[in-house]
Amino acid sequence: MRTVLHYVAKGMDGVERILRLLIGIAMVIMVVIIFYQVILRYVLNSSNIWSEELARYLMCYVVLLGAAVAVRKYSHLQVDFALNMLPVRARCIAVVICTLAGIVFLVYFCQYGIDLCLNTANSTSSGTGIPMSYAYACLPIGGVLMILASVEVILKELTKFIELGNGKKEVQA
């Protein structure tokens, strides 16, 4: 189990590095676009449509790609009062069950995102002219990445559960 986890973690490390780079680039582009829009609107008393729309689409990608990183790092907001009261092995099982429930939700989330992309394949956005399916593609992309991160979380917790059952006192998953 530890070997499988090692290879999955190495692969996800690479995915996370790419995601962090893409998120950083998207954030810089968003700041530049919004700054441009503010200058255009309040200094030059002019406006355009594309900048606000593009910033909104970039924000959706940033949020969903960032959510995948957050799942992997256990960084999502959670109420863990009851979870922390459990013994370590029971906590592992509870995390696995909750993560499996999250995966079920994410499968539906991805399916909805794919349906939305397919239904909007022939329409374009009014401001930028890009296909709406590109804007909505963040849903299945983010969902799949969150599922992959969730699988890694499950493997970490199961590895910890097994190793604690084999008599180890402290386990780093």
Which residues make up each language-model segment?
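Alpha-helical transmembrane segments and membrane-interface helix-loop junctions
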Residues: M1-A173
